[in-house]
Amino acid sequence: MNTDIKNSIDSRRKFMKLFGGGALAGGAGLFISCSGEENKRKTAFIKDMKFGEMTYRISPKSGDKVSLLAFGAMRLPWMINENSPEKEEIIDQEEVNGLFDYALEHGVNYFDTSPVYCRGFSEEATGKALSRHPRDKYFLATKMSNFASPSREDSLAMYHESFKALKTDYIDYYLIHAVGEYEAYKERYLDNGILDFLIAEKKAGRIRNLGWSFHGEKDFFDYMMFESGVEWDFVMIQLNYFDWETTQGVTNVNAKYLYEVLEKKKVPALIMEPLLGGRLANPNYKAQEIMKRINPEESCASWAFRFAGSLPNVLTILSGMMYKEHIQDNLKTFSPLKPLNDSEKKALSQVVSTMLEFKSIICTGCNYCMPCPYGIDIPAIFHHYNKCLEEGNFPDNPQSENYKKARHAFLVGLDRSVPKLRQANHCIGCGKCVPHCPQKIRIPKEMQKIDEFVEKLKTQA
């Protein structure tokens, strides 16, 4: 194995052993249909595509001119290291470099990562790719992701490791990562003095903008905005047309409320999950019919991005772009962004109604619930269930003409998508995953429902 690669892997292994792997994200770019057919691919793109000028927003706090489209590095391309006896998966750095170069070339200047993304390798890959460019040509965002070990010593180690991995001496946008309730916030940032440390780092110039990402209850959001005593430079919220007026799981606040509070306080909103974990890029067939009737040439993803981008207090919108065609489709939307008109907004209300009819599981595929101590592949199980449901190929009615075909596709596709030992019937209901889910999904309960559904299908010939 190449010495640099080996040292990199060993270093990140030690780091992730210390801080946990609760946000394992990445994989090899596997796309699986309801029937379980796989499609692994390398980047392909049309070289001569032309785009207009990227849309930019000015931060009212810092004056930064930020591209409305941001590159989220939660998932990056992987490759098999053929020089390794273990044939380990490693980040495909050459591919990452190409993606970042292409994005920068076309006006994207905001890049978001975390110490726990991509099995702990995202910051390093991001640093290698971006350090090849002048530092004043991009804004760099990372996070204090001290979920597993919130001690002061370990949190400080995580902070300093980020600078080393990212090859920088300052971070433009630093986030308190995924806070949603007071006790966890108190343990991770107040009791250990880390919040005071980060505020001091901002005064020293090593952090240019300090903010936080929110997953939680209304009371905690209100505390952070009105009672925390901190003047935040930005807040990252989950916002999309489905969440705008809808509350999910056991959360009690919608995106409209979050956005309007930030707008009134003149705090810029950074947007995560504009596609709801990819579900809005490929919604159910009824939703797609509504969109295609109005804009037959536009992708479903573009509708979701335009919804978020039409809101004036949005500074930037994160998108994970593992392939250059993803970047190109987004560039068509953001270069420049065309705000939604009234008829399009009305159509999206109809789309939301169809999505509520389908009763999908609200998993976004963030992988924060992983790894399961019993090996259950939680995101893959939910993805397969939702995929079959939203494709209109769900075997819930034995009297349906398509039932036998749909039943076969569901069962065969499940075995192709998820190894049998990692399926829902092996969940023991320990609940260790539940506190880590930003969507507040009652995961053991959903696993039980899916297991019962699968067993029912197996007994119905």
What is each PLM-predicted segment?
Residues M1-S11:
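N-terminal secretory signal peptides
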Residues R13, E53, V179-H383, K387-A406, ...:
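Beta/alpha (TIM)-barrel catalytic core signal, keyed to glycine-rich beta->alpha loops juxtaposed to Asp/Glu
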Residues S59, F71, F111, T126, ...:
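Conserved, mostly hydrophobic/aromatic
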Residues E89-A103, S151-A165, E217-M225, A301-F305:
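Short, acidic/polar
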Residues L166-A184:
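Active-site groove signature of glycoside hydrolases
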